[in-house]
Amino acid sequence: MLQLRFMPGWVPRNGFFGLKETIGTVHKRFYALASEQPSRKTVKPLDSRKTFLIDTYKHLMENSSMIFFVHYNNLSKTEDHHFRFKIKQTGGKLTKVRNNLFEVYLRNSHLPDPCGFVKRKEQNWKHPLLPLLKGPTATITYEDTNPQQVAKLLKVLQSAQDKLMVIGAKVENEVLNVEKINTFKTLPTKPEMQSQLVSVLQMLSGLGLVRTLENSSNALYLTLKSHNDNQKPKEDVESTTDAESKGSK
């Protein structure tokens, strides 16, 4: 039996909250929970805003290859729209976050359900991203790892001055500070690096082939010479040996 209940602004998918459904021109926001599925045991009510936000941060972190943390300082509505558009042009998405709830997610991110009940000693209080959540914070997320997108993003944020300031990032499984981010933006893309690696491997394999052919030629020469010597009559071999010894004198 499927029970439906309308909600104020979000909808769960696969047990976790996701984006609202759009049907025609009407945005219907609802919550559906099947009795056949095991219910989640969360600290806050399943239909609460806090549970929704923690689920949102879980989705951002698990589905983004690159996530940048920025100070979001006193942007006007016009500036907010402007920079969201510029960031979107680089392939990214700007999301304002609530630090206290993002901290909950980070401390519990190693658990199956970050919204669930957990003892204090089981939480990760040394998560490397926790120090970044100081003051008004936003994230800029990218689905793929691409240093060129980072270079474009930093160029966009330069015009924002201190209103949008990068303070750190997580690129795949590595946490980067500002210095490492500036180094990362100069790297080639993955396809370029793969192409360079293929070229190096081809070069090395070519050198190996030359050496193999040289060694094979030398081995073949020695084998043929030995076989030829064995086929000669003993007298010829002795005379040849005497001639070689005289020549050496």
Swiss-Prot record:
Family indicated by similarity: Belongs to the universal ribosomal protein uL10 family.
Subcellular location(s) per record: Mitochondrion
Sequence segments annotated as region (Disordered): 226-249
Transit peptide: 1-31
Functional description taken from the UniProt entry: Component of the mitochondrial ribosome (mitoribosome), a dedicated translation machinery responsible for the synthesis of mitochondrial genome-encoded proteins, including at least some of the essential transmembrane subunits of the mitochondrial respiratory chain. The mitoribosomes are attached to the mitochondrial inner membrane and translation products are cotranslationally integrated into the membrane.
Entry's Gene Ontology cellular component terms: mitochondrial inner membrane; mitochondrial large ribosomal subunit; mitochondrion
Name the record gives this protein: Large ribosomal subunit protein uL10m
Other remarks on this protein: Present with 6000 molecules/cell in log phase SD medium.
MF annotations from Gene Ontology: structural constituent of ribosome
Main location as per UniProt: mitochondrion
Biological processes annotated in GO: mitochondrial translation; translation
Quaternary structure and partners: Component of the mitochondrial large ribosomal subunit (mt-LSU). Mature yeast 74S mitochondrial ribosomes consist of a small (37S) and a large (54S) subunit. The 37S small subunit contains a 15S ribosomal RNA (15S mt-rRNA) and 34 different proteins. The 54S large subunit contains a 21S rRNA (21S mt-rRNA) and 46 different proteins.
Keywords: Mitochondrion, Ribonucleoprotein, Ribosomal protein, Transit peptide
Gene responsible for this protein: MRPL11
